[in-house]
């Protein structure tokens, strides 16, 4: 279902990679494709079913013989698997889409379930558009299908129309009115058109549902599906209220989210609950001080519980002395090594000018002469690149290093940006490892600027760099120059500290 949100279909290899991540995270059941839809989807379901051992594989099928047979064939190498058949049950869908009455719908559903049971004893049935289906009809079809051997009854809010107390009432009614309901697991499948997918899912499990269908990061058609990571952590954090648990390895949540975001080319919003970059980030000085004293003051869950290493305090003009002091202590400096009052004044000036300040900026403010700090040691005087499709890229750069000028060239098969970075590295000889490269368009049309943000690793420390220009090659070069100057400042700090100790 999540793949419906993507502009292009995923390859078999990409789907398998996602499936392996989900398996490692401890997902109970993964619905991995719709085999009848294309040969590629059939191959994906087949490949995943052959490689996944610890999660149950499920395949989707309409109430059509060929769909069901194809689903069974795709998973025939599995010892255990599930076939998930679905059919619309709302009056609107029956009349305008299927052109059938409810008795015909029941007959189709029963026939399809019996067909699926030829391949596996684990059959799930979805009453498509269940949230807009009359309660009488819903109870009637659910009872008949459970009698046929359906193990899981799914109640989808197909168009994201319902609200939490309404879905809760639907589930409660099923438990009260369907006599054989205890023979099947009740599932919910919510969409996020009104922004209530997670809330609806939680209300459903409070009413008795025991399976939640969703996607990591909430990706899916239209406004998306239930974000599984949000439901999972809600169940964990509010176990006192819900009294439930899952089999999920919570420490794999963040990594799985990042992998899926990258493969699907769908960036995670910074304010996304649980996995967004700001989810455990604190900028306010009051909040930062509170978190440093006791993280529970402003955090309801431990970042490490989803696989993050530690709290992230953003150093901005809103940060207080406590945050600045915390970063200096994290870098190994004692209070006696610097003047916190002077440092904080200089920090605020830099934060107003720069926006976000990093640990190495604090070092420079504390230990480098202010006039010296304002000077950029490295300055790009000239660059040229030549790149031919399906061939090597060549770059030549002229770099001002203090009062000396150096020129260097480089040739690589990895493109013009890599060629420029190699040429710069030949001049500076800094053993840099590029960890992240991100290009963002600023503005529109021919005058748009390309902002390049990079993250590099140098001797166990991370350094950020930003470049902005209409030419993305130039902005890439500027970002690396930014990094080189930050590294140089750290080297100057170390040099000055050594001189002080002599």
Swiss-Prot record:
Region listing for Regulatory domain, in residue ranges: 379-502
Function: Catalyzes the condensation of the acetyl group of acetyl-CoA with 3-methyl-2-oxobutanoate (2-ketoisovalerate) to form 3-carboxy-3-hydroxy-4-methylpentanoate (2-isopropylmalate).
Domain Pyruvate carboxyltransferase: 1-254
Species annotation: Buchnera aphidicola subsp. Uroleucon sonchi
Catalytic activity entry: 3-methyl-2-oxobutanoate + acetyl-CoA + H2O = (2S)-2-isopropylmalate + CoA + H(+)
Its EC number(s): 2.3.3.13
Protein name, UniProt field: 2-isopropylmalate synthase
Keyword set, alphabetical order: Amino-acid biosynthesis, Branched-chain amino acid biosynthesis, Cytoplasm, Leucine biosynthesis, Manganese, Metal-binding, Plasmid, Transferase
CDD domains membership: DRE_TIM_IPMS
Family note: Belongs to the alpha-IPM synthase/homocitrate synthase family. LeuA type 1 subfamily.
Intracellular or extracellular location(s): Cytoplasm
Listed GO MF terms: 2-isopropylmalate synthase activity; metal ion binding
NCBIfam families xref list: leuA_bact, PRK00915.1-1, PRK00915.1-3
GO terms classed as biological process: L-leucine biosynthetic process
Superkingdom of origin organism: Bacteria
Binding site residues for Mn(2+): 1, 189, 191, 225
Pathway, per record: Amino-acid biosynthesis; L-leucine biosynthesis; L-leucine from 3-methyl-2-oxobutanoate: step 1/4
InterPro entries found in the cross-reference section: 2-IPM_HCS-like (IPR050073), 2-isopropylmalate_synth_dimer (IPR013709), AIPM/Hcit_synth_CS (IPR002034), Aldolase_TIM (IPR013785), LeuA/HCS_post-cat (IPR054691), LeuA_allosteric_dom_sf (IPR036230), LeuA_bact_synth (IPR005671), PYR_CT (IPR000891)
Cofactor: Mn(2+)
Primary location recorded for the protein, binned into one broad class: cytoplasm
Quaternary organization: Homodimer.
Gene3D superfamilies: 1.10.238.260, 3.30.160.270, Aldolase class I
GO cellular component: cytosol
């Amino acid at each position: 279902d999540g793949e419906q949100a993507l502009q292009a279909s995923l390859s078999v290899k990409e789907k398998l990679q996602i499936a392996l991540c989900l398996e490692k995270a401890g997902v109970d059941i993964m619905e991995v494709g719709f085999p009848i839809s294309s040969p590629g989807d059939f191959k994906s379901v087949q490949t995943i079913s052959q490689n996944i051992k610890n999660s149950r594989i499920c395949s989707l099928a309409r109430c059509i013989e060929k769909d069901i047979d194809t689903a069974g064939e795709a998973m025939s190498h599995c010892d255990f698997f599930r076939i998930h058949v679905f059919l619309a049950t709302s009056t609107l869908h029956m009349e305008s889409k299927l052109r059938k009455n409810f008795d015909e719908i029941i007959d189709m559903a029963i026939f399809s379930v019996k067909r699926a049971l030829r391949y596996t004893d684990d059959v799930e049935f979805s009453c498509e558009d269940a949230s807009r289906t009359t309660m009488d009809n819903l109870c009637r079809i659910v009872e008949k299908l459970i009698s046929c051997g359906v193990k899981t009854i799914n109640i989808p809010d197909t168009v994201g129309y319902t609200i939490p107390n309404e879905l809760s009432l639907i589930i409660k009614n099923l438990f009260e009115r369907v006599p054989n309901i205890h023979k099947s697991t009740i599932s919910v499948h919510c969409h996020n058109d009104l922004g209530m997918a997670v809330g609806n899912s939680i209300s459903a499990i409070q009413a008795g549902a025991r399976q939640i269908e969703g996607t990591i990061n909430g990706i899916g058609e239209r406004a998306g599906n239930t974000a599984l990571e949000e439901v999972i952590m809600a169940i964990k954090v509010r176990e006192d209220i819900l009294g439930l648990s899952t089999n999920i390895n919570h420490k794999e949540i963040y990594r799985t989210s990042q992998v899926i975001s990258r493969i699907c080319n769908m960036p995670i919003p910074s304010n996304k609950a649980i996995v967004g970059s700001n989810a455990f980030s604190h900028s306010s000085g009051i909040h930062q001080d509170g978190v440093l004293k006791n993280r529970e003051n402003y955090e309801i869950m431990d970042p490490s519980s989803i696989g993050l290493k530690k709290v992230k305090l953003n150093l901005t003009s809103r940060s207080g002395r406590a945050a600045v002091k915390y970063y200096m202590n994290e870098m190994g400096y004692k209070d006696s090594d610097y003047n916190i009052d002077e440092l904080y004044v200089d920090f605020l000036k830099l934060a107003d000018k720069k926006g976000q300040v990093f640990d190495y900026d604090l070092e420079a403010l504390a230990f480098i002469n202010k006039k010296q700090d304002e000077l950029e040691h490295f300055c790009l005087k000239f660059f040229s690149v030549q790149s031919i499709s399906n061939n090597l890229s060549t770059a030549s750069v002229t770099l001002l290093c203090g009062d000396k000028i150096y020129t260097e060239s480089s040739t690589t098969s990895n493109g013009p940006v890599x060629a420029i970075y190699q040429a710069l590295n030949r001049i500076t000889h800094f053993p840099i490892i590029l960890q992240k490269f991100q290009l963002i368009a600023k503005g529109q049309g021919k005058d748009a600027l390309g902002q390049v943000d990079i993250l590099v690793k140098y001797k166990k420390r991370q350094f950020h760099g930003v470049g902005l220009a209409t030419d993305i090659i130039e902005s890439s070069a500027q970002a690396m120059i930014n990094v080189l100057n930050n590294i140089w400042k750290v080297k100057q700090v170390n040099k000055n500290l050594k001189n002080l100790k002599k």
